[in-house]
Amino acid sequence: MKRHAAALLAAAALATPAWADPGVTPNRILLGQAAVFSGPAAQLGIQMRNGIKAYLDYVNANGGVHGRRIDLITEDDKYETAVAPAASKRLIEEHKVFALLGYVGTPTGAAHLPVTTAAKVPLVGMFTGAEILRVPMNRYVFHVRASYYDETEKIVEQVVSTGGKKIAVFYQNDAYGEAGRKGTEIALTKRGMKIFSSGTVERNTVKVEDAVKAINATEPDAVVMVSAYTSCAEFIRQMKKVGSGATFYNVSFVGSKALADALGTDGSGVAISQVVPFPWGTAVPVVKEYQDLAKKAGFTDYNFSAMEGFLTAKVMVEGLKRAGKSPTREGLVEALEGMRDVDLGGFYVSYSPTNHAGSKFVDLTIIGRNGKFLR
C-alpha cells in the first residue's frame, strides 16, 4: 500500500508542470489588486479597477493570453497603512494570485511592498509617483506612470513661466505628501527659489483650517497640492471663501474626476498634472481603445484614474504574452524587463533590468466652468 501511494505521489509530481507558480492553471491566470475601495479616497481604487477590468474583459473575450483567461480578485486596504499588509497577504497566501497590479497610494504602497517583495510576486502599476517606492529599484515592482518629481517639475515650470513667484505647498502629512513637497522643493531650488509657505492635513481627514490660515496669510501666487481629493477640495473651498487669489495645482494622485465632482462650481480654474493621456480625446489610439472597451464593459464615465488602470492592464497583459505559454513569476519579471520603448497606442513604456520607471509622460489640465477638463 505504501509503495502504491508513493508511486501515485511520484506520478502526480511528474504530471504537475515544473513552471506552475501559484495562480496559474491550464485555463486561467489569477491576478490580485489591493487598493482603496472604501472611505474618502475610494474612487481612486474603484476607477483604477474599472479601467483594469475593461481591458481584461476584452482580452478574455478574445481568447485570453495563450489560451488562459485572466481573472482579477481585489482586497480593500482602506488607504490605511495598518490594513495594507494583511490585504496583500490574503491575495498571496489565501487567494494564491500569480501577480499583482493596480495598487493605490504611497503610504499604503510602502506598507504593502515588504509583503509582496518577500514573496517575490511581481507588481505592475502603482497609482503613486513617490521616489521612496522607486529608489532603490525593486526587482518585483514595475511602474507605469511618471514620478511626483516629474509632475512637480512640470507644475513649477508652468507657474514660473506665467510669472508666479510665491509658491506654497499644501500636503498630506505622510510619505505621499512629503514626496510631493520634496519634488516641489527640488524644482524650486533649480530656479533659485524656495517654498514660500506650507500647511498640512492628516490622511483620511478634511481638517484643513490650520493649513488655510498659514498659507493664506502669505498671499501666494500658486499652491501646489499633494493630498487626497476630499481634503484638497475642502482646502480650495476654504481658501476661496477667505478671498485667496492663488491658482491651485494638484498632482495626479488627487483623482481628477473625483476632485472636480467634489468641488462643483468651485473647481473652475483648478489645475491638475496628469500622467496618462487625456481620456476624452480621440487623437491618441489607446484613448479611443479605452473609450470603446470601457463602454462595452459598462463604464461610460471616462476619467484619468480608469485610463491609468487600463494602461496598467495593457502592460501586464503584454508582459504575460512575452512570458510565454509556461509562465512563472521570475519569467514575468524578465519579460517585463525586456519591454523597451513599447508603444501601447501612443503611450510608451520602457523597462530594463536596471530601470523599472516605465514612463515620464506628464501633461497639465484645467477644470473648466462646467466641470469638464481642458488641456
What are these regions (language model features)?
Residues G32-P40, I272:
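Acidic/histidine-rich, surface-exposed loop or edge segments in extracytoplasmic proteins
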Residues P22, R28-L30, Q43-N50, Y58-I132, ...:
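Beta-alpha junction/loop-to-helix N-cap segments that form part of ligand/metal-binding clefts
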Residues V83-A86, A130-I132, R139-G243, F278-K288, ...:
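Extracellular/periplasmic Venus flytrap/periplasmic-binding protein
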Residues I236-G309, I367, G371-L374:
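Extracellular/periplasmic periplasmic-binding protein-like sensory domains
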Residues N27-I29, G67-I70, E94-A99, A118-P122, ...:
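Loop/turn elements at helix/coil->beta-strand transitions in domains of secreted/extracellular proteins
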Residues K296-A306, V317-F373:
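Segments of small-molecule ligand-sensing domains
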Residues M1-L30, L374:
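Short, low-complexity disordered leader/linker segments with a strong preference
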Residues L91-V104, V124-M126, A168-Y171, E219-A228, ...:
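Periplasmic-binding protein-like
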